[in-house]
């Protein structure tokens, strides 16, 4: 199925393996303590498997970006990883210099080291062609002391940076278990989708939703798109519904005016497939009031209405495949979390193959205790959106090209 190598294709016993992961995590700015270790747990399967195969594992990762308060070293990450893996993960305060290379050379079978934050290196934040990235100091220096490269960082796969796209041009390379699982799942809902397929798109990132809609409606993978959040407001406005000045101001303040025109084009072309709310919940002086869309007063819309929830829940029950991204409303406030929670409960109780993406929706599912009833919660963020939008992901493309080159000589 895969056009790239997976971990099944190589024997790592006794070999030095460089593993790129994405363990970028929320950090307490005062204590430096990691507040959520979810991403580290997601990569644990790949790392444990390599240790069990007696590989010598060097981890390459980033934390935040230059200028941010949480742009820190990887020292705390090594401690958390040690606890998760139940074995020492040695922090090396170097990326590709003498200390890093010597640490890699001196590893014993089953050892794991975590190199310094790769974004401390200036060239790492530059997005360039893989051939250029393959000649950076980072890639050339580390390639000289390792035998294999594994990319498990699906969440960063949309970035053409040295640590993500350079190594497959220098080393035998494969996708890690998390990368493999993410790609397999997303292919299933785009290429091998079981119908009917329902997309539930909410939240505030209108550009993401518009890009996804353009692709999935054009390729026919989606049967229905259920809109909520600011996404719904844009489509209501595009449909000629008077959402009132306060709600229009929010759209204009966020520079979403251009998306209203895009939404109108999509609605005109695929109208029957794009569902918008029939009622909404407004915040009137701190109180939830449900109103029909043809009678919205000048108060901010904070959620979809109860009638809309019923209609959307029925579409979810009929679906064989479901993808959801973004909350239905201001779910942080209990009285306006009804839309988000009811739709998530409908997804969890359905027999469909279900995928959710986005940190807010994943957090809501976790808080509700239904994460285990969702088939897949994507770690991808921007990479997931790019994939569903039909974009090529540079880190995956170079893995595929590496396999093509290798297969020629077999």
Curated annotation (Swiss-Prot):
GO terms for cellular component: cytosol. Pathway: Carbohydrate degradation; glycolysis; pyruvate from D-glyceraldehyde 3-phosphate: step 2/5. It is found in: Cytoplasm. Homodimer. It holds the Pfam family PGK. Substrate binds at residues 22-24, 39, 62-65, 119, 159. This is Phosphoglycerate kinase. Keywords: ATP-binding, Cytoplasm, Glycolysis, Kinase, Nucleotide-binding, Transferase. Gene3D superfamilies: Phosphoglycerate kinase, N-terminal domain (3.40.50.1260). InterPro entries: Phosphoglycerate_kinase, Phosphoglycerate_kinase_CS, Phosphoglycerate_kinase_N, Phosphoglycerate_kinase_sf. One of its GO terms (biological process) is gluconeogenesis. Its EC number is 2.7.2.3. It is an enzyme of class 2 (transferase). ATP binds at residues 332, 358-361. GO terms for molecular function: ADP binding; ATP binding; phosphoglycerate kinase activity. It comes from the Archaea.
